Amino acid sequence: MDQPQIILTEPGRFITSRGTLPDPAPEEARIRIRRIGVCGTDIHAFHGRQPFFEYPRILGHELGAEVVSINGDSHLKPGEVVAVEPYLNDANSPASQKGKSNCCESLRVLGVHCDGGMRPEINVPIRKLHRAASATMDQLALVEMLCIGQHAVNRSLVSFPETALVLGTGPIGLSVITFLKGQTKRIVVA
C-alpha cells in the first residue's frame, strides 16, 4: 500500500514523502492512526538529543488507532478502536517470560528504534493492541504516557502516611501526581 508519511531526516528537519506499507505479517494487524501524541522523546529526537535514535525515522509511539485488518487469530475485529502498546519485544525472551518485557534484549519502540505512526496506517503485532471502545482517540494518544506514570507509582511502593517527592511537572510528572493522589498523605513537587 502506497501512503504519505512524515520523516525526521536529521535533527530539526521533517519531510513528507510517500512510502509503501507491506501486507501485515502473520499475527500482525494493520491499524489506521487517528491520533498521535507528541512525546518528550519526539522532541529530543527533533533536537538531536535522543541517544537511542537513528535518522531517518518516522516518529510516533503515542497512538490512538482503529483496526483495519488482521492476519491471524484475534479477539479484535476490523473497525474496533484500540490503544497501541508501542514496545515491540520478543514474547519468548527470558526477560519477557519473567514479565520484564522492558528488559528484552531485542526490544524496539515504535517511532524510536523502528518507524512509528506518523503515517495513515501501520502494521503491529496483534498482541500489542488493546480494545478501548469507551475511550476517545484523544484519550488513547495519552495512554502510553499515563502508563509510565502509573508504573512509576506502582514501583515506588509509596503509601499512607508517607510523603512522595515528584521531580518535574512535565506530562509524566503530572501523571505520577494524578496516580499518587489518594495513595499518599503528602505530595511534594519540585
Sequence positions of predicted segments:
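Cytochrome P450 core scaffold surrounding the K-helix E-X-X-R motif
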Residues: 41-43
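Mid-domain Rossmann-like dinucleotide-binding core that forms the NAD(H)/NADP(H) cofactor-binding site
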Residues: 135-190
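Cysteine-cluster motifs in flexible loop/terminal segments that predominantly coordinate metals
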Residues: 76, 85-133
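Short Gly/Pro-enriched turn/cap motifs at secondary-structure boundaries
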Residues: 9, 20-21, 54-60, 110-114
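Glycine-rich beta-strand-centered segment in the early N-terminal region that forms part
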Residues: 22-36, 49-92, 133-135
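Extreme N-terminal starter segment of soluble prokaryotic enzymes
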Residues: 1-4
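Conserved hydrophobic/aromatic beta-strand scaffold that supports enzyme active sites
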Residues: 16, 64-66, 121-123, 129, ...
